[in-house]
């Protein structure tokens, strides 16, 4: 084959693979990740049991279709040829067998690695092995790669993540690429053509607004979104998100013991309001029915998964009234509105629709969590709300 023709065919092939990648994550990705609950305590049996549980409890059919094995799945060193090796005790049948099982159950298979020389838990990282590792992932049937940012030395974040993106393209298997760079190099400004989602902050843990070293409660992470980018409302960090590329405020802590039921519901509601990827982080094998019902609520998930792809924003914050109001533009002229009680005790919250200046016109109001009509926007709405709980509404244009 002559050289110009060969180069042309390579370019066509690369373009075709890139198009397959661009067709992923048109709505925020949904799934489950092992880290928040299990950390290093993972194995083949756990992953299979999790998949089976997500079928039985309705999570798979609700859209949670990625199952992601986080850090600590590897052996401590590569083999003599430089290949990654799954831990033979945790995964005695290798990772292709795990991927095959997940695919047979209707899931997609996700895995973790790191842009540095070692992962955050001190296993082999991807730096210098990107193309080799991408081929391994493809051979195992990997559909999702979470790529962390530990032990990166002086590496440039944008170029490092682009290298892994190019390696995934070259391997030929469409992989949803999740950049876990913690927002240190403002990935929202450059990552839309590199990956499908990017972390905006450090790690979450199961707390409302606590801080534990590197980890933060979900409300603290939510508040941080407003210090990352100059601007307010729709001009804040949400302007960088949309179909195929999403701001990622980290995984869900819904159902974990550090949160009350109300705090879990508020956490879930507000992640849906900001069009966040919804990666469950609890032990779904032993989930209480009320958390199952929360995480599979179709009306709430529809807010997160709305095809318009707009990220919601804080429209009103009144600490003296213990209220924050978040709004999210939806398809077909509809809106979602979420009112959070920031008080340490139950409070009466009043939503005055005329104060939400971006929502113009008259709307019918539906209370999403109670699945009941809640009047219209010509009259304010008042209800008693538990500490750190929410009111969640969907607004539909009033019929003339």
Model-derived features with residue positions:
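Carbohydrate-binding surface patches
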Residues: 271-274, 279-281, 319-359
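C-terminal beta-strand-rich structural cap/linker in extracellular carbohydrate-active enzymes
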Residues: 376-400
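Boundary at the C-terminal end of the N-terminal hydrophobic targeting segment
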Residues: 16-20
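Aromatic-lined carbohydrate-binding/catalytic grooves of carbohydrate-active enzymes
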Residues: 50, 54-154
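Catalytic cores of secreted or luminal carbohydrate-active enzymes
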Residues: 266-316
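Sec-dependent N-terminal signal peptides
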Residues: 4-13
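Structural recognition of the beta-strand scaffold that forms the well-ordered cores
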Residues: 28-34, 63-70, 108-113, 143-148, ...
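Glycan-recognition surfaces
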Residues: 132, 176-282
């Amino acid at each position: 084959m002559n050289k110009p023709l060969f180069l042309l065919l390579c370019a066509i092939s690369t373009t075709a693979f890139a198009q397959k990648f661009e067709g992923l994550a048109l709505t925020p990705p949904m799934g489950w990740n092992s880290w928040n609950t299990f950390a290093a305590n993972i194995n083949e049996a756990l992953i299979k049991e999790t998949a089976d549980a997500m079928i039985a409890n309705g999570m798979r059919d609700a859209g949670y279709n990625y199952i992601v094995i986080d850090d600590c799945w590897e052996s401590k060193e590569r083999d003599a040829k430089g290949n990654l090796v799954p831990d033979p005790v945790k995964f005695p049948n290798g990772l292709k067998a795990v991927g095959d099982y997940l695919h047979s159950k209707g899931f997609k298979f996700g895995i973790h690695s790191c842009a540095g020389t070692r992962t955050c838990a001190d296993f082999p990282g991807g730096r210098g092995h990107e193309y080799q590792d991408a081929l391994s992932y493809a051979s195992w049937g990997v559909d999702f790669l979470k790529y962390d940012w530990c032990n990166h030395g002086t590496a440039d974040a944008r170029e490092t993540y682009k290298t892994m993106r190019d390696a995934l393209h070259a391997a030929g298997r469409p992989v949803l690429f999740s950049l876990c760079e913690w927002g240190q190099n403002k990935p929202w400004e450059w990552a839309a053509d590199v990956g499908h989602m990017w972390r905006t902050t450090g790690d979450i843990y199961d707390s409302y607004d606590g801080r534990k070293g590197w980890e933060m409660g979900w409300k603290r992470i939510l508040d941080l979104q407003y210090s990352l980018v100059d601007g307010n409302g729709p001009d804040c960090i949400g302007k960088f998100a949309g179909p195929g590329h999403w701001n990622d405020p980290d995984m869900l802590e819904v159902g974990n013991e550090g949160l009350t039921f109300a705090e879990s519901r508020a956490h879930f509601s507000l992640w849906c309001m900001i069009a966040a990827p919804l990666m469950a982080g609890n032990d779904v094998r032993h989930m209480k029915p009320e958390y199952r019902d929360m995480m599979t609520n179709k009306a709430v998930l529809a807010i997160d998964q709305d095809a318009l792809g707009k990220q919601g924003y804080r429209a009103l914050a009144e600490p003296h009234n213990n209220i924050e109001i978040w709004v999210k533009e939806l398809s077909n002229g509809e809106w979602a509105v979420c009112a959070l009680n920031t008080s340490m005790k139950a409070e009466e919250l009043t939503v005055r629709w005329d104060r939400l200046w971006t929502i113009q016109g008259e709307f019918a109001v539906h209370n999403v969590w109670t699945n009941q009509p809640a009047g219209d926007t010509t009259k304010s709405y008042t209800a008693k709300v538990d500490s750190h709980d929410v009111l969640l509404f969907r607004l539909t244009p009033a019929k003339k």
